[in-house]
Amino acid sequence: LAAFENDGLVRDPDTSIAGTEVVEVTVPSGELVTLSTGFKVTAALAVESPGADLPELVTESPTFVFEDDSSEDYYQVVVYDAVGDIVWDASNIPGGSGGGPVEVPYAGEPLEAGMYYQFRATSIRDKNGTITPISRTEDLRGLFVYSP
């Protein structure tokens, strides 16, 4: 699986490109399954903070910082708690088209002290109303624990 190491790559989320569809496979107990379907990867949006490499202690309301994509129209940033519930979802964050890192201050409900969180950013292209995700941050980055 492409998601289980920090290698600067993510499964390409652009569904307008052949071979990028999410593949789901049900494996009956004790049976072998052969897969003929592949998938494509693309460069991930690099997380700068918090949680660029390891979970990071955050003592104030966080600002999420990640590398700017060069071809996005806007971003979406979603914050999850330790059990995977969405605690904040910000869409239509303006892109800079490759002009330095993107900084997004957290503007959701108060975070719970001692809770682990993760932010994920997705770059979005909007071509004549057709919305297409083109890259995102890696699944194992952007982790932080809130401790005011």
Predicted regions and their residues:
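Conserved aromatic anchor
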Residues: 60-72
